Amino acid sequence: MKSGRFIGVMSGTSLDGVDVVLATIDEHRVAQLASLSWPIPVSLKQAVLDICQGQQLTLSQFGQLDTQLGRLFADAVNALLKEQNLQARDIVAIGCHGQTVWHEPTGVEPHTLQIGDNNQIVARTGITVVGDFRRRDIALGGQGAPLVPAFHHALLAHPTERRMVLNIGGIANLSLLIPGQPVGGYDTGPGNMLMDAWIWRQAGKPYDKDAEWARAGKVILPLLQNMLSDPYFSQPAPKSTGREYFNYGWLERHLRHFPGVDPRDVQATLAELTAVTISEQVLLSGGCERLMVCGGGSRNPLLMARLAALLPGTEVTTTDAVGISGDDMEALAFAWLAWRTLAGLPGNLPSVTGASQETVLGAIFPANP
């Protein structure tokens, strides 16, 4: 069974940077050693946003974007190696999620697409890469997402305490770690995605730092109720979603009914939408004693306060409080999934994704010996 140093690479739906994590992994433990966040050039970020919202590209443009992202991921890995004074031979493998540009797990031909050419990463780092983690689960009738609940269960499950792990990235997803029950998990809906999109369009800021804009506004209840009527929120699990659904166009369609509103009030309403949709799903899933939050949203004081208010009797904390960096959780999970793939172990949970069976995930891109 392969064990040693692994690197995880994650570029999520928030597009706030490439997260790279170094960890030692074996069958008994996962120990994080180092991490860094690598910037995504504005032009590349915009190209990804455009394709996620349905802008058509030529095959040549699509191929160039795939190559550029692969090179970006390789640069991020090499920066971490240099920082830690490590060589390619010191690393067993890289687990690279890739950049999701489309996720449509239901319909006539279910599919998901993550890009960022893994061959570029191998060529530029000299390290074996495991990638393309989601499509095997979809081929077996699953959603292909979320995949991180398996990792949450391995690290954070408790024999008697009802726990849930909440990742608030661009999309928010919940892992249900309930003693005596199969692991559960699904996407609750938008996390930071709509809040980030709104403040970017209105104020040119990548995100609402410390929720300053949202705190200065007031929740527009009719707008909130209008958004909450979206059928995704009442859809039963298993379910997953992404930027191809909850994007700026989705927000604009709801705002048409509310002309002339204060932009800060919209920001406050979007924060409340995220908090309400998460808390409703926590309660519908039977509630928990402890909700451990990770991802960028864990640093949003308004979101954290609203979750605590909407979930009385639940201890709302961060994964940092139990020794796991909330910023690095997803990248760490894909390092762990790469270890499982190389060990020939399944990486999905049918109780979460709805797949017909457990399966080894991903494709292996071996480095030269």
Swiss-Prot record:
Catalytic activity entry: 1,6-anhydro-N-acetyl-beta-muramate + ATP + H2O = N-acetyl-D-muramate 6-phosphate + ADP + H(+)
Pfam families assigned: AnmK
Binding site for ATP: 12-19
SUPFAM superfamilies per the UniProt record, alphabetical: Actin-like ATPase domain
EC number of this enzyme: 2.7.1.170
Annotated metabolic or biological route of this protein: Amino-sugar metabolism; 1,6-anhydro-N-acetylmuramate degradation; Cell wall biogenesis; peptidoglycan recycling
Enzyme class: transferase
GO molecular function: ATP binding; kinase activity; phosphotransferase activity, alcohol group as acceptor
One BP term from GO: peptidoglycan turnover
ATP-binding recorded as keyword: yes
Keyword tags: ATP-binding, Carbohydrate metabolism, Kinase, Nucleotide-binding, Transferase
InterPro entries, per database record: Anhydro_N_Ac-Mur_kinase, ATPase_NBD
CDD domains xref list: ASKHA_NBD_ANMK
Family listed: Belongs to the anhydro-N-acetylmuramic acid kinase family.
PANTHER family assigned to the protein according to its UniProt record, in alphabetical order: ANHYDRO-N-ACETYLMURAMIC ACID KINASE
Described function: Catalyzes the specific phosphorylation of 1,6-anhydro-N-acetylmuramic acid (anhMurNAc) with the simultaneous cleavage of the 1,6-anhydro ring, generating MurNAc-6-P. Is required for the utilization of anhMurNAc either imported from the medium or derived from its own cell wall murein, and thus plays a role in cell wall recycling.
Protein name: Anhydro-N-acetylmuramic acid kinase
Organism: Escherichia coli (strain 55989 / EAEC)
Gene: anmK
